[in-house]
């Protein structure tokens, strides 16, 4: 589980030209927040979205959606150490729904598969694309997230591999 905050502005993928190029850009004042949970086996994504803030209530709402999805198995959520994931209300709702948390070490987004998904969404929806209004921006992101596990399955399957780099016989230096 992780949150992504998509800002309605221009993201340039790559640009190399010898002449001056003017690119349209929206104001960048609106933000589309997506709190998501990724099923690492089926690559299905369950999300909670808003335009204000991601907080403990958002996490509780996402956990309720996860529990209502009817997986029929114990749910363990792997998450980073965001403050809103460690509130008392979040623990109460998790206990009520039978959900457990597994926290990743600090500063290790490379271990969270959903971070790769957010990078994929940015590449597909935002890089070198212009959205005149916020509704089209939000719709593009939402529709990709909702259908990615079907339409972009091959790309996601290679991106969401469980192969993580490991280091053997590494010496750590103390300072």
List each language-model region with its residue ranges.
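RNase H-like two-metal-ion nuclease catalytic core shared by retroviral integrases
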Residues: 79-81, 88, 103-124, 135-137
């Amino acid at each position: 589980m992780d949150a992504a905050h998509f800002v309605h502005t221009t993201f340039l993928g790559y640009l190399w030209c010898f002449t001056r190029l003017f690119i349209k850009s929206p104001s960048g004042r609106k933000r589309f927040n997506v709190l998501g949970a990724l099923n690492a086996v089926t690559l299905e994504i369950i999300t909670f979205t808003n335009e204000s803030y991601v907080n403990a209530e958002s996490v509780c709402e996402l956990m309720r959606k996860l529990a209502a999805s009817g997986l029929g198995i114990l749910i363990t959520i792997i998450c980073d150490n965001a403050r809103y994931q460690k509130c008392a209300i979040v623990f109460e709702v998790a206990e009520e729904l039978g959900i457990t948390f597994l926290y990743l070490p600090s500063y290790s987004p490379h271990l969270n598969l959903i971070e790769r998904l957010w990078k994929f969404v940015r590449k597909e929806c935002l890089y070198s694309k212009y959205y005149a209004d916020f509704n089209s921006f939000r719709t593009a992101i939402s529709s990709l997230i909702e259908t990615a596990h079907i339409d972009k399955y091959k790309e996601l399957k290679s991106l969401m591999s469980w192969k993580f780099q490991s280091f053997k016989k590494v010496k750590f230096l103390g300072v």
